[in-house]
Amino acid sequence: MGNREMEELIPLVNRLQDAFSALGQSCLLELPQIAVVGGQSAGKSSVLENFVGRDFLPRGSGIVTRRPLVLQLVTSKAEYAEFLHCKGKKFTDFDEVRHEIEAETDRVTGMNKGISSIPINLRVYSPHVLNLTLIDLPGITKVPVGDQPPDIEYQIRDMIMQFITRENCLILAVTPANTDLANSDALKLAKEVDPQGLRTIGVITKLDLMDEGTDARDVLENKLLPLRRGYVGVVNRSQKDIDGKKDIKAAMLAERKFFLSHPAYRHIADRMGTPHLQKVLNQQLTNHIRDTLPNFRNKLQGQLLSIEHEVEAFKNFKPEDPTRKTKALLQMVQQFAVDFEKRIEGSGDQVDTLELSGGAKINRIFHERFPFEIVKMEFNEKELRREISYAIKNIHGIRTGLFTPDMAFEAIVKKQIVKLKGPSLKSVDLVMQELINTVKKCTKRLANFPRLCEETERIVANHIREREGKTKDQVLLLIDIQVSYINTNHEDFIGFANAQQRSSQVHKKSTIGNQVIRKGWLTVSNIGIMKGGSKGYWFVLTAESLSWYKDDEEKEKKYMLPLDNLKVRDVEKGFMSSKHVFALFNTEQRNVYKDYRFLELACDSQEDVDSWKASLLRAGVYPDKSVGSNKTENDENGQAENFSMDPQLERQVETIRNLVDSYMSIINKCIRDLIPKTIMHLMINNVKDFINSELLAQLYSSEDQNTLMEESAEQAQRRDEMLRMYQALKEALAIIGDINTATVSTPAPPPVDDSWLQHSRRSPPPSPTTQRRLTISAPLPRPTSGRGPAPAIPSPGPHSGAPPVPFRPGPLPPFPNSSDSFGAPPQVPSRPTRAPPSVPSRRPPPSPTRPTIIRPLESSLLD
């Protein structure tokens, strides 16, 4: 791929970096970059300055770079620099750039030589650079100097690893040529995070400072300690050159001259030097960006989809539009009306699967809670019979009656009908509360405008309470109507004749066949206590029995309990218990289950308890209304009189009891039918009509429109941030989409072939030229190395390591014949047992025979 295409591609990433850095998202997005890693005084700063063509990085002894420097190089006709923290300010004097880097470093890290992982973003525009993005990291050091913290080595290592462990970060490992390459900290760190060598580019500096008679040809030809992407050699300015004001241009010319004139490098001069390093880095970065963009695009699209639904309500919002408030108010009231109706009437669109809607809860009130409250109020048999007995006796007075008085029937019936007011009014209260809860949920969409939300909720809630009063009046009127006239000619009323015939019979509940009424999970709490813990079972309620199974597959039945003579009662919630409990018991004092008189069943909520009670009621299991233990004297007298009733009075009581039961069943059916209809008409439908027709007018009349449509500061900020993020994501995806599809990437180089190491051990003595370069070499690998075969063990084949690939021919010694290459023992078999040659310390004048590039066959870098 040509330089033109590279120049088009890499600025896209710079634009992405700027777009998200401004939003504080740079730390979340791993964009392709090149991290420069090396020891202190390895020449990292000089390499970067050669790219820019200017002196702009701080220099000094010890640790100078204490924060990562994100350096973006941009080709431009003008030459200047910009910092992200000083956006808009152009630095044309690069001495000021150096001072700003030092000042910004001190602002975060202080003056105690500490470090920080917060990057400094610097963009340099120049006609002398190619488009590159690099990160200059602090130099690797091991011993703290001066007032550096004791753990400075680990701090620097952690910070470097924070950058180079990213899969989309290329590593520029800088190593001086006059040090031991096998012990390069930069290469070791790169090898640790990039064992395949796909992300590592080696840079050899200070080639001009090597001792006389030595060179780095084998390293630069990628023969010694090879890297998959190879090495590039550079020659930087010395401190003497810098002090002598030698400019970058002159240094580049001197570098070019050095490679062309050096006998060991002239044949590879076109692949050496800072200009070639720039091109290599550009090519590698471009390839890496192209490989990363598909995953990056998917990540951006995922973020875009996650906020798109919220942004949909924001993106058409235009504060500068004078009519926006009227339009927004109208749309929000309409949406509120639609949401309210959907929650009440139900809708197949966007069904909530987590909780019941307002309409579903009102349905449960109508058909489960209200009937249950009626039955719970109605069935108190002993008290009812006592009241009938008193009514008969009081009507007869001093006389002895021969016939059953119908006035006693009317008195008892009217009293029972009046008792229906309690459950009826309670159902109105429950429905009102559900309507208000529904309104609160619907106004959440208006949360962008707190005043509008508050006013809407207030107006609708006030109307609901107003309708509640009128609905209660109508409910009381309906019950009073029933009390006003007792219609004994009703077609379903049994009449006196039938009541007398049934007076001697025991009243039995009517069954509805053996159909399944309800299924669900319940916890048997009292049995579980005896056996070490409560257990959950799958219960099936029919019209005749209550069965429970091990699970909802209903294969293993645990027990079947007949419903005859069963009643249900409430059980107080236990201490520290989150369960709601009710109990079943037998009215004839028999055991319900094995040795247990009560069967206590637990639910997760009171709603579930009420629902199960209503289902049991449908099956004929009525609630028990226990009579208090503290009885008054009148109760005791009345109870005594009940025991002393004569047979005639007993027959009259039973007759009226049957008449009351028959007539109240008619009234109950009527009330259970009319009360929900009354609530629906006077309350629910009226509230819906009010919201559709009058809410908007009342909002306009209640407050000024501008006041209603004022956004909260938090919402305005959130909306702006959401829209800005949305636009940034759209722009980022558009930038990625702009990449020329015709561009192609250079494929990654194959794994390096280290089979030449095997051959070199078996080769005849090298030529004098080669001998000069290999005067002193490092020892061969120890025979006990755990990461490679021992030297004494012959290799199974010439290609036992990485797959063999063609490599650049160099002045390698001639290979022995093939019969020798497998059978001959390694050259110098006693070499592994010898201590490595000592490296004398640098002191003037340097020893002409001192090795500069030590070439150990380090298994940690070769495997």
UniProtKB/Swiss-Prot annotation:
Region (Disordered): 626-647, 742-863
Origin species: Mus musculus (Mouse)
Region G3 motif, residue ranges: 136-139
Comp. bias regions, Polar residues: 627-642
Residues that bear Phosphotyrosine: 231, 593
Modified residues (Phosphoserine): 763, 767, 847
GED domain residues: 653-744
Classification of source organism: Eukaryota, Metazoa, Chordata, Craniata, Vertebrata
G5 motif: annotated span: 235-238
Segments for region (G4 motif): 205-208
Renumbered residue ranges of the record's region G1 motif: 38-45
Subcellular location: Cytoplasm; Cytoplasm, Cytoskeleton
Reaction(s) catalysed by this chain's protein: GTP + H2O = GDP + phosphate + H(+)
UniProt family annotation: Belongs to the TRAFAC class dynamin-like GTPase superfamily. Dynamin/Fzo/YdjA family.
Region annotated G2 motif, chain positions: 64-66
Major localisation: cytoplasm
Biased composition (Pro residues): 791-816, 826-849
PROSITE patterns assigned: G_DYNAMIN_1, G_DYNAMIN_2, GED, PH_DOMAIN
UniProt domain PH: residue ranges: 515-621
UniProt-listed Enzyme Commission number(s): 3.6.5.5
Protein name (database record): Dynamin-3
Chain positions recorded as GTP binding sites: 38-46, 205-211, 236-239
